[in-house]
């Protein structure tokens, strides 16, 4: 297995310390009569890490390995890290009579497993002081519940979303008190402007 202490959606430009944990299974010989041991493969020899920060080959013949990256800056999109494991030749299987049975598993490489951290820009909403909504994939539908009173103290309810979402068409819906359905509102009543947040183009 290959796991990471950081995963899922993270804000672009945020700094993370990431620890990767690898557990290697040598498999088993079943049934195991009189072989030297019941493991199908030999011990691991090297753990091969790859990712946006480059590659590293770590010599290690134990079944677990750990790698830590400190101060990693989350990039936009997929930040994919992987690890493959090289292992030595396995034990010679034996038959119930103690004879060699087939051949030992040759030395080889366990195919790489990967974890992905997705860097995204946040979406903000609110009146006056805006707050971030939970991070989500760029281009997916942004759904926020507006308050009944959309103007407070001269400030209007506002949504700010990065331009990577600009291919989406904003829609405002209001619940119809009679039908209880959600009706689309006239978008000409709403203003969409270009703004900049920390150097990132946004729509508001």
Region spans (language model):
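Acidic, Ser/Thr
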Residues: 21-28
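Preference for solvent-exposed, low-hydrophobicity sequence contexts
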Residues: 100-101, 120-204
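Hydrophobic/tyrosine-rich beta-strand signature of extracellular beta-sandwich/beta-rich modules
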Residues: 81-85
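Short, solvent-exposed loop/linker segments at the N-terminal edge
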Residues: 6-17
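Short, solvent-exposed loop/turn segments at the edges of extracellular beta-sandwich modules
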Residues: 86-103
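Short beta-strand segments within Ig-like beta-sandwich modules, predominantly Fibronectin type-III
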Residues: 53-64
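Proline/serine/threonine-rich low-complexity linkers at boundaries of modular beta-sandwich domains
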Residues: 1-2
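Surface-exposed, short loops/turns at beta-strand junctions within beta-sandwich domains
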Residues: 63, 68-80, 90, 194-199, ...
């Amino acid at each position: 297995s290959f796991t990471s202490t950081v995963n899922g959606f993270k804000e672009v430009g945020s700094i993370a310390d990431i620890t990767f944990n690898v557990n290697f299974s040598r498999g088993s010989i079943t049934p195991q009569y009189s072989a030297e041991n019941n493991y199908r493969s030999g011990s691991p020899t090297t753990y091969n890490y790859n990712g946006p920060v480059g590659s590293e080959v770590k010599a290690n013949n134990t079944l677990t390995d750990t790698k830590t990256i400190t101060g990693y800056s989350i990039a936009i999109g997929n930040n994919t890290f992987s690890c493959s494991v090289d292992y030595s030749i396995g034990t010679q299987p034996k038959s119930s009579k103690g004879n060699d049975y087939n051949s030992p598993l040759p030395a080889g490489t366990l195919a790489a497993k990967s974890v992905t951290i997705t860097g995204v820009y946040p979406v903000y909403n609110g009146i006056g002081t805006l707050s971030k909504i939970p991070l989500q994939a760029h281009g997916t539908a942004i759904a926020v519940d507006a308050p009944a009173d959309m103007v407070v103290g001269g400030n209007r309810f506002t949504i700010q979303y990065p331009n990577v979402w600009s291919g989406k068409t904003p829609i405002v819906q209001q619940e119809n008190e009679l039908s209880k359905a959600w009706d689309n509102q006239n978008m000409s009543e709403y203003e969409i402007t270009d703004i900049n947040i920390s150097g990132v183009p946004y729509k508001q």
